[in-house]
Amino acid sequence: VSDDASGYEPLFIFSWRNLVVGALSLAFLGGAILMYLLWAALFNEIGIGFFKELFRKVWFVTLLGALSFGGGVIVFRGLTDVVDSISRLLSGIIKLLLPFLLVMTAVFLVALPFTGLEILWATNQGTMLLMVLTFILLLCINAVYQTGAAENPYPLWLHHAITGALFTLPIFSALSFYGLYARLDQYAWTVVRYWAVVIWLILCLFSFGYVLAVIKCRAAWPTMMASVNSILGVFVIVVLLLSNSPLLDFRKLSLASQMHRLTSGAVSPEDFDDQYLRNELARPGYLALQELTAQDP
């Protein structure tokens, strides 16, 4: 386990550096956008509307955004000491917030049987919120326990409480799956829902990985974080590569699902969302619409 932790430590450090660099670059991008807007407003006030119109062009905004974000990445990657200091500061803040976050999740689970699941799905945001909560929990646990090789960051009683709270992660995964399945049963597959299932699967595997670490090592479960994260990290890379390759084209899969709804009579031709095919499924959707148009008497 110690060998795994020592080999995992550089991966952990680089991952958090990249995360902080990305966040700082996004903040730099936000500042650049405000500067561009001020620029356009100032010149517009003196009767020069060229820049206001220029900043409304998609190609120009995309170019400026890419250059600003890329410039931020270049600058902040060179400030390693600053980035590491920010990472340590964030880790300290998250260390204070994690117990409160776990209390919130425990109270939520206790309240859920009294409110029922129906109200959770009423706004169509319940699944997303549960997945976001699971991601934040996993992120905070990693930020606090890091490689798992250091000494316990909490008093023993609080560490045991956090250990027990890890068993809530599979519960949130199960609730998220229920919400996803309900939407799929009603509206079939879309590109967004495929990505939602991919994200759910990744979060679910990490959740069960940590629970298995608790079952195997009990209170010493952080020592297995390096192994769990390394193995599942490779899985995440493989899934992302497949998801962006012809082997797992979500547009074609979504098209097949939507067309099956139409041909099976699950949805009438009048209620069929042809705009989704046209606007979201790119060329496969366009070709399918052409075929439907040719078949229409």
Which positions does each model-derived feature cover?
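Alpha-helical transmembrane segments of polytopic membrane proteins
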Residues: G22, E53-S68, A122-F135, V192-L205, ...
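Membrane-interface helix-loop-helix junctions at boundaries between adjacent transmembrane segments
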Residues: V1-L63, G78-I94
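Membrane-embedded alpha-helical segments of integral membrane proteins
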Residues: A161-R218
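Hydrophobic alpha-helical transmembrane segments in multi-pass integral membrane proteins
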Residues: L34, V103-L112, P170-Y181, F208-A213, ...
